């Protein structure tokens, strides 16, 4: 290939690259974000079950007739991970306009975090870090910061959900065993059109007294009086996929 043709080809490639960059920043300046642009997406979002119980959970997540999905079981079984992936997939497909991440602000055992400076995202970030870590697998830090700023991804304490109406949103309540029965009832009654609520947790890993364990209370109520619009999934130690040692650690503390 001649130098002239090589130079022309390089110039054309640079022009296309600059067009992509210009489009990207124009979209940001116009306060829009296109989740379908291939240069903005790290990888496709696929929910692949690795056990029968995970398959049941994914079916509940993808079932439009299930307005609320409740899942409980030990650490490392994919409760939070699969729930977050389903929410991101719904957001990317335009099935919802935002994702709301929440959890009870209850410290592990006697651990005290004290006062955290900054806005609500900064204050809640340590509490929802596992959910944000999943988000960062699929979007760059710049994209994550943008979505937080525009409240496409919203972080809120569970107590702040009182009085709100969640419309066209997927809401994920993590560590639900640390919520009280009244808090979980409050959250579920906030649902509105086009929304889904995912409630995850481990009834055995509560930092509250047993009678205050909202997740344990909810699962008991659902087993006694099933509701067709609420999907219920249970995981066991056999569903642990994070690391094989977790099952042995849990048995060690039984």
What residue ranges belong to the model's regions?
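Interdomain "pre-motor" coupling segment immediately N-terminal to P-loop NTPase/helicase cores
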Residues: 1-37
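Conserved helicase motor core of SF1/SF2 NTP-dependent helicases
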Residues: 2-4, 16, 37-46, 54-60, ...
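Residue-level marker of regulatory loop/turn positions in helix-turn-helix DNA-binding domains and
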Residues: 50
């Amino acid at each position: 290939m001649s130098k002239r043709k090589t130079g022309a080809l390089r110039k054309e490639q640079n022009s296309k690259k600059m067009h992509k960059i210009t489009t990207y920043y124009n979209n940001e300046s116009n306060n829009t974000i296109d989740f379908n642009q291939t240069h903005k997406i790290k990888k496709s979002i696929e929910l692949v079950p690795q056990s029968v119980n995970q398959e049941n959970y994914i079916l509940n997540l993808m079932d439009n007739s299930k307005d609320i999905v409740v899942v409980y079981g030990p650490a490392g079984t994919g409760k939070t991970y699969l729930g977050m992936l389903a929410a991101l997939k719904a957001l990317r497909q335009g099935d919802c306009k935002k994702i709301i991440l929440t959890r009870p602000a209850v410290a592990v055992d006697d651990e005290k975090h004290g006062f955290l400076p900054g806005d609500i995202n900064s204050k809640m970030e340590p509490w929802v870090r596992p959910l944000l870590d999943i988000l960062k697998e699929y979007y760059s830090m710049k994209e994550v910061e943008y979505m937080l700023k525009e409240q496409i991804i919203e972080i809120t304490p569970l107590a702040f959900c009182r009085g709100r109406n969640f419309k066209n949103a997927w809401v994920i309540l993590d560590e639900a065993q640390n919520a009280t029965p009244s808090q979980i009832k409050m959250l579920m009654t906030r649902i509105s059109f086009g929304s889904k609520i995912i409630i995850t947790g481990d009834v055995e890993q509560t930092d509250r007294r047993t009678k205050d364990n909202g997740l344990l209370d909810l699962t008991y109520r659902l087993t006694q009086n099933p509701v067709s619009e609420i999907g219920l999934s249970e995981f066991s130690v056999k569903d642990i996929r994070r690391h094989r040692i977790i099952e042995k650690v849990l048995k060690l503390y039984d």
